[in-house]
Amino acid sequence: MSVSKTDLWVGMDVGSTTVKIAVVDPSTGKLLHYSYQRHNAMQAQKVLQLLQEAHGLFPGKTFGVAFCGSGGQPFAEATKSFFIQEVVANALAVRAKHPETRVAIELGGQDAKVIFFERDKTTGQLIASDMRMNGVCAGGTGAFIDQVAELLRVKTEAFESFACRGKKVYEISGRCGVFAKTDIQPMLNQGVAKEDIALSSFHAIAKQTIGGLAQGMEIKPPVMFEGGPLTFNPTLVRVFKERLGITDEQAIVPEHSEVFVAWGAALAVGTMFGDKDCQYREEGSREALLHFNELRQ
């Protein structure tokens, strides 16, 4: 690994619904601590909480911190940390952990991405050659699962247990939660099993991601599956594999895939910013995060 100017590398992925932290040993690149938590629209409080917990676990250690994610940049500025684009953080993690990957499918709280990788012809390094992202509607994302779970009156955490028992697949729109509701409500009225609706929702997500995002580009294996919705819903991964026609050996679900991008951000502290001094300090960052919302107004 790169020479480190701090004791630990820390990556924070601030998304639309969750905050993820990854603490990495600079000498090995191994994950020492991680956490994935919903922020319930209180991003600053959750970022502060996760950083304080990490400092409590590693007292006296200096942190080099890099933020990524849709909400990461203002926190990087407030805490005098580094900022890295999410797709770059993803590529760093893929390069370090699973360089055989050709395509990564990542589902977040309110976005979905398909990232295509290839070898740089000059350096031979794995790079992200193309990325497709929905970014407009929550269809085909974790929020879509939340919406369907609410319609079924089941907890999001229990959704997988319903889907894995589903037997029959019905046509449900994965493009939008509003359209999905018009498909699902009549099914409920007709007595269709919740298990079948949950499974059908996973098929809708996979169909939307493969057809809507890839837009004709071939998804070649090995394919990596990342993000909370794919980590906590193994049936969703199975559905993707079925629709892509790939085997278990051609599918990669990385260790701790729910914080995989945060892991990449942590690696960036050394691999991309190693020659720069990180200005992050525990006390100064705590004060900045405590008053984050006031300063942003």
Which residues does each PLM region occupy?
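Glycine-rich phosphate-binding/hydrolytic loop that grips phosphoryl groups
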Residues: 142-147, 253-295
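Gly/Thr-rich phosphate-binding beta-strand-loop-beta motif of the actin/hexokinase/Hsp70
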Residues: 2-28, 101-121, 168
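Glycine-rich phosphate-binding loops at beta-strand->alpha-helix junctions
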Residues: 71, 217-243, 254-258
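Adenine-nucleotide phosphate-binding core of ATP-dependent small-molecule kinases
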Residues: 180-215
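Short glycine-rich, Thr/Ser-proximal phosphate-binding strand/loop in the N-terminal lobe
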Residues: 6-46, 127-135
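Glycine-rich phosphate-binding loop plus the immediately following alpha-helix
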Residues: 119, 127-168, 267-271
